[in-house]
Structures are given as structure tokens and as C-alpha cells.
């Protein structure tokens, strides 16, 4: 029978000093011997996705203590990618993921906690906590802050739904009036919560459901809705139950590594492909799999992308649907239900509810279960009132959206595309692969041949796009922005948004060893591996080179001979794999990240071989 980890610091004569300190935190005599459960919060006033989390930790903690555990809350950092976007702050975004993972490990191991409830929400916080959960392998439940309501504004006598990407695109369009931009800016982000489309934050929170590590509804229930409170309360009760099953019944099936198996990672990736999620999810799933000891690779993602159809298009891939619409259509359980009916889900994986994924789908899929209370749960909708308060409204749609022919979620027979929403491309430009979000690419440009225009940084690319250097037919190459080369692997949301602003959204491609925001759409190909700083062929591209992109055949190639490529490589080896004429101040902390970082095909995790 596993011993409580916390017994290390709470039991025995020699731990009198530690117990004295535990007592000073409020522990009573009868608390010693109970599981100590870390409530890992990420409240901050910098991030709308986290601004409402201040009281959530104590909400969960109170429920844990009612159920027989001892709850101790601590906080992690949280970076807002949207606010950090377009300047040097973006260099810190991806490194913050690993810092969060480390900080959770430090706190939990230093204090010998027995289990965790992870209260996350935005882009790097959920992945960082997920990496920590897999690393620590103690009972863990994720409960996120929930999505923001979609923005709405009246323009040209039409009520238009908006999100933050609309504000970015319109602001750079010289033909758009200041008044229109102001109206969009003020309406795009109306409430607390993670940005309202299927951007990185919401994608990752949805994937925790598919992995089995969060409760049904976690990825889609709005932050503002009163029903979300029950997810926090239930997480507090359920984590105590998981502790009992593991520490009292020796049931290891409740541990993150037992839940997050290879099959579970396949389920998560299949969901991601079906919903056209953020390409960042690939990076984070690969990283989490490594922490879990699961051999899940780019080749597996490529294989899944060839058989899993695109069943839903959500903003930024369409203006029609946002996360509130996904929830109305049955949420992630609804999407997984359709994948199950198509024979594309492993139903035997475990979940934090203590049941198999198949059993969970029987209970929570609105197509197979007509229970009135279940449908009421998924009818939870937006109020359309500006607020930073969680659980502040109780509005509901009249009906759920169970239209699997033309609705927000489709069945396989009526799929938006039999091609999945994400694809892996290989070729002489990306020998270890690169990622494109096909759900956000117009099918007319799935095959694209263009002329390279090369930039050594995101900043130069932005100046080139807004300055008119980029023309129709160009492939914009932004290099030395990978995990090592940045360092930090910046998101390229501004370059992709500005291509749309300049009317080039369907007339150009963008290729980078950096990455993209979940808000990106268009022919944007990222995560090119190996990256330029690691000797990748993207570092050998020259202005005027022809680049061929072929999504249906999963290929991307630089149209020069092998001999010319070898000659260029030899020349670059002599010069060194560094950006030409780029002035960028890089802190010591970022240099450390860059030194240890692997390429994107490895999840941009730290290279452990450097420590041997």
C-alpha cells in the first residue's frame, strides 16, 4: 500500500519542527495523517483568463477539507500571450511553460504533497501544469477558469461576433476608420476567461478532457456561467476520492501516467485534429508525453492527421462559432462522441472520474444520453454583459445544438473535411517535420508554390509586410525564431494578421521555425524542424528561391538541387548558424532556456543529454 508522501514531514519524533510549522499554517491535531492536497492556482490581474481565479483556490480548498483532505494553496506565474505579443515580451512566453512545470515540482516535492488540483486556464499555464503532473505522477485533477464570452458589436447595422484577432487585423488595415477600430477594440474581449475561440488556451483545456485529466465540460463551459462553479467543487471532492483509491486501495489507475497513456495521447491528438485546434498543442502534447514517458512523436501525429476528419470549425477558423457554441453542441464529450462513432477513439483509457472514457461518453455525450439535466448543463450560454466575475450569470440557450449535419459539431459522414484540421509536412525544408493548421487554410491554397522572401526576425518581417515589401506569391520565411534561435520560439500572430490586413491572406504563405498563436489562420506553417539555429535547411533559404507547399501530400520542399543545398550548408557551417544583422537583447534567463532547448519536433523541452 503506498504511503502518504506527506508522512515524510508529518510523522515521527524527528519531524516535530516540521509539524510545528504545519500547525502554524492552521493544521489541527486530527489533520495529521490526512492527505495534503496542493491547490495549484494561477491567479493574476495581468491576464483576463486568470483575473477571476483569486477565490477559486479557496473554493476548491474548502471542498477538499469537507471531503476529508487538507488543502494548501500556492500560485504559479501566468503570461498573457496577447499582451506579450509583438514585442520582446513574447520571448518569455514558451520558456514560462517550463518555469511553471519546475515551480510546481519544486513546491509539491519540497512540501511532500500527496495530490494536486491544478487551476489553470491560459496558453502556457495548462501545458506547464500538465508537464508537472506527468513528472510528479501523483493524483491530479485539472479545472480551468473557462472560456471568455465572444465579443459582439454593431457595425453597418449588423451584430458581429468578435475576438481579439479581429482587433489586431483591423487595426493594421489603413482602409479601416479609427472609429471602427475603437468599436472593435472595446467589444472584442467582454468578460473574464480565456479568449473566446479555439485558440491555444481553450485547445489545451479541451485536450485535458480528452486525456481524461479534467471533468466533462472543463474545456467549454463559460467562465461567467454559474454552472462552472460545480466543476470547481466537484474537483475538490473528487481529488480526495482519488487519494483514497491510490493511498488506501493501492489503485494506481488514478495516477496521471496511468491516465495519460499512449492511447490517451492519441485520443487528445485526434480531438485536436477534429476540432482544428491551435498548432501549439502539438508542441505541448509532445512535451507532456516526454514527461509521462510515452513515446508519442510527430510521426504519430502525421498518421492520425491522415485518418481523422475535421468535424468542427471554430474561431479563428470561422467567424460563425466560438467556444460558447461548442458547449451548446455538447462540448468536448460531444466531439469525442462523434469520433467514437467513427471508430477513432480508444474507449478503454482511464479518467479522473474513475471510469473509462467509453463509460464517460455513455454518460456525457448528448447524442446518446437524452437526460434532461445533462442537456440543461450544455444549454449554459452567454449573457453578453461585460464582467470580470466568475459564475456571474445563469443564461441558457433554449435548446442544445444536436445538429450533426450542419451544426457546430458534425458527424463523420457530414464532416467539414475528411482531411483533419492539423497536418504534419515533411521535406528537404523540414526533415523532422513542421505543422500547419489546415482548418484555417482555404482549400484553394492547399497547394502553393511561391518565391521566398527571407527575414531574420519577426520584427523585420512585420516591417516588411507593413512596408509593402511582401507581394502576392511570396513565401514569407521568418527564421532564427525557434526555441534556440529566438531564443524562446515567438508566436507570429502579428505577421499573419498583418498579411490579412494588407489583403494578402490568401495570396501568400508564411514559413517559420517559430510558432503561431492559436489565433492564427491562413497558410501559416510553423515549428520547422530542425530550426535554423540547429542547422536546419530553413537557414539556407535565399531570397528568390522557389518553395513548394503540398498539404494533400504532406510535403514542403525548397526547389534547389541536393548539390546546391550541400554547397550552401558548407558555406553556412563556416559562417555559423546565427541570424545576420539582428540586434536583440537576450537576458541570461533566456540564454539558459535557449542553451538547453530542443527543436519543436521534440516539444521544445530541455535536452537532457546535455546533463550527461
UniProtKB/Swiss-Prot annotation:
Binding of Mg(2+), residues: 81, 123-124, 491
Pfam families in the record: ILV_EDD_C (PF24877), ILVD_EDD_N (PF00920)
Reactions the enzyme catalyzes: (2R)-2,3-dihydroxy-3-methylbutanoate = 3-methyl-2-oxobutanoate + H2O; (2R,3R)-2,3-dihydroxy-3-methylpentanoate = (S)-3-methyl-2-oxopentanoate + H2O
Any one GO CC term of the record: cytosol
Keywords noted in UniProt: 2Fe-2S, Amino-acid biosynthesis, Branched-chain amino acid biosynthesis, Iron, Iron-sulfur, Lyase, Magnesium, Metal-binding
Active site: 517 (proton acceptor)
Keyword Amino-acid biosynthesis tagged: yes
Enzyme class: lyase
N6-carboxylysine modifications at: 124
InterPro entries with a match to the protein in the record: Dihydro-acid_dehy_C, DihydroxyA_deHydtase, DiOHA_6PGluconate_deHydtase_CS, ILV_EDD_C, ILV_EDD_N, IlvD/EDD_N
Cofactor binding, per record: Binds 1 [2Fe-2S] cluster per subunit. This cluster acts as a Lewis acid cofactor.
The protein's Enzyme Commission number: 4.2.1.9
PANTHER family, per the entry: D-XYLONATE DEHYDRATASE (PTHR43661), D-XYLONATE DEHYDRATASE YAGF-RELATED (PTHR43661:SF3)
Subunit structure, as described in the record: Homodimer.
Name of this chain's protein: Dihydroxy-acid dehydratase
Taxonomic path: Bacteria, Pseudomonadati, Pseudomonadota, Gammaproteobacteria, Pasteurellales
Gene: ilvD
